[in-house]
Amino acid sequence: MNRLLSVFALGGAVLLAGCVAPTPKPNDPYYAPVLPRTPLPAAANNGSIYQAGFEQNLYSDRKAFRVGDIITITLNERTSASKNAGSQIAKTSKTDIGLTSLFGTTPNTNNPFGGGDLSLEAGYSGDRATKGDSKATQGNTLTGSITVTVAEVLPNGIIAVRGEKWLTLNTGEELVRIAGMIRADDIATDNTVPSTRVADARITYSGTGSFADASQPGWLDRFFISPLWPF
């Protein structure tokens, strides 16, 4: 008996551990700054007014388009979702069996224990009903900015960017991560691009500390609202 209780306790601990969200950690290698693959050679000073390596096209701008360049992404995300679901199942069954004879004969239906004669008639009726309703609403708003680096430039000119920002506060840390693809034409003259122009965007806003813990339900509450709850 004690062994069975230990098995159930261990299984419950494993299930409850799966309900705990992982804590984000800084210095993720995937979001680390990407440096240029080939550093530019140092130009020799020949004493002339014109120095090779410092030239700039008259009609070009300072937009980021090389690996390792810096781009600022302005976050302006708003999402809302609502879902309603309802189900109702009802079933009624009834069966009546009436017999006056059995194999061509009428059996003796006298009750030897008293209280009236017995009967060959039988009946069954049953009702079953199940009803469920659910409703879920969610809304999120994320505004701000984050500066990332160019990780890769594809042959068609699409720029892959990614980066993260950690803010250390009195009661914990806040994390903003973003990764995605942008077009060079969407980069403004001040080297910024809105997050709504980022394709295949992966935006993460999370944190650690007392504020992050206060916004999360307890482990037992997460179990009751999880698919593991049988009712």
UniProtKB/Swiss-Prot annotation:
Residues with lipid group (S-diacylglycerol cysteine): 19
Keywords: Bacterial flagellum, Cell outer membrane, Lipoprotein, Membrane, Palmitate, Signal
Pfam families: FlgH
Record flagged with keyword Membrane: yes
A GO term from the CC aspect: cell outer membrane
Lipid group attachment sites (N-palmitoyl cysteine): 19
Membrane topology annotation: Lipid-anchor
Signal peptide boundaries: 1-18
Annotated localization: Cell outer membrane; Bacterial flagellum basal body
InterPro entries reported in the protein's UniProt record: Flag_Lring
Record flagged with keyword Lipoprotein: yes
One GO BP annotation of this record: bacterial-type flagellum-dependent cell motility
Main location as per UniProt: membrane
A molecular function GO annotation: cytoskeletal motor activity
Free-text function comment from the UniProt entry: Assembles around the rod to form the L-ring and probably protects the motor/basal body from shearing forces during rotation.
NCBIfam families referenced in this protein's UniProt entry, alphabetically: PRK00249.1-4 (NF001304)
Family as reported in the entry's similarity comment: Belongs to the FlgH family.
Oligomeric and partner information: The basal body constitutes a major portion of the flagellar organelle and consists of four rings (L,P,S, and M) mounted on a central rod.
Alphabetized HAMAP family for the sequence: FlgH
Protein's recorded name: Flagellar L-ring protein
Name of the gene: flgH
